[in-house]
């Protein structure tokens, strides 16, 4: 069997962990680089069910770090201790590819492959399309069609949108670097973000955290397949539902 550190080295070459934000926790979160693994699983998030279904000695590659904030206690009756207990008992290793992967792969997938926009400029965690000159209503319908959803929360501050900005995941706080008549497409838009953006003449479209990043597992699987690794993709439904 192959070693965890061999996969870690491949991932680091393609999406260097040093690119992650200072507050992030990408890299080997659980296990040892010298461990052998029985299978590779790629997922957006490690859920309790994914941990239960995984083989012993598996390697799970996830987008969101299971261990994100420093742990003061490890309570197996609370999150994330309930999942960590299973992983440790089954000798499962976990690699997280978070903000480093946003910069190198996932944001491009969100804006280009999923939403089908081109001519994009990289600005930190954002991808920007200048002089898009598109009507807000047309833009909103295009995004809903691309995501396959009927409704999206949004802030319509102007009918004509000059510049577009894309941030997969939770990027609503980044609108402060934009100008009036811009539109930021991201996830996790909060009430106060919406109020401030509206006052500045900036539009927002909440494509949701889930939909903007759900391509993660497939991208990782395709990358590792090119290095002759077999990867099982574990998908799950968005836990937030509109009823």
Swiss-Prot record:
It catalyses: GTP + H2O = 7,8-dihydroneopterin 3'-triphosphate + formate + H(+). InterPro entries: DUF34/NIF3, DUF34/NIF3_sf. Gene3D superfamilies: NIF3 (NGG1p interacting factor 3)-like. A divalent metal cation 2 binds at residues 64, 209, 213. Pathway: Cofactor biosynthesis; 7,8-dihydroneopterin triphosphate biosynthesis; 7,8-dihydroneopterin triphosphate from GTP: step 1/1. A divalent metal cation 1 binds at residues 63, 102, 213. It holds the Pfam family DUF34_NIF3. Its EC number is 3.5.4.16. One of its GO terms (molecular function) is GTP cyclohydrolase I activity. Belongs to the GTP cyclohydrolase I type 2/NIF3 family. Homohexamer. PANTHER family: GTP CYCLOHYDROLASE 1 TYPE 2 HOMOLOG (PTHR13799:SF14), NGG1 INTERACTING FACTOR 3 (PTHR13799). This is GTP cyclohydrolase 1 type 2. The lineage of its organism: Bacteria, Pseudomonadati, Campylobacterota, Epsilonproteobacteria, Campylobacterales.
């Amino acid at each position: 069997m192959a070693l965890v550190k061999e996969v870690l080295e491949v991932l680091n070459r393609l999406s260097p962990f040093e690119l992650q934000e200072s507050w992030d926790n990408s890299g080997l979160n659980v296990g040892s680089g010298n461990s052998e693994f029985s299978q590779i699983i790629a997922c957006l998030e490690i859920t309790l069910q994914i941990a239960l279904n995984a083989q012993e000695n598996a390697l799970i590659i996830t987008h969101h770090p299971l261990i994100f904030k420093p742990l003061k206690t490890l309570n197996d009756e609370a999150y994330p201790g309930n999942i960590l207990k299973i992983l440790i008992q089954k000798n499962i290793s976990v690699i997280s590819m978070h903000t480093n992967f946003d910069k190198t792969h996932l944001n491009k997938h969100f804006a280009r492959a999923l939403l089908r926009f081109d001519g994009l400029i990289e600005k930190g965690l954002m991808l920007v399309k200048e002089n898009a000159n598109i009507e807000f209503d047309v833009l909103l319908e295009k995004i809903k069609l691309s995501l396959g959803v009927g409704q999206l929360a949004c802030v319509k501050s102007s009918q004509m949108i000059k510049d577009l900005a894309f941030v997969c995941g939770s990027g609503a706080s980044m609108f402060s670097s934009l100008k009036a008549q811009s539109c930021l497409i991201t996830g996790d838009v909060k009430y106060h973000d919406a109020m401030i953006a509206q006052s500045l003449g900036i539009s927002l479209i909440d494509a949701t955290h889930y939909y903007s990043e759900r391509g993660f597992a497939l991208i990782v699987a395709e990358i590792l397949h090119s290095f002759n690794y077999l990867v099982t993709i574990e998908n799950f439904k968005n836990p937030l539902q509109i009823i």
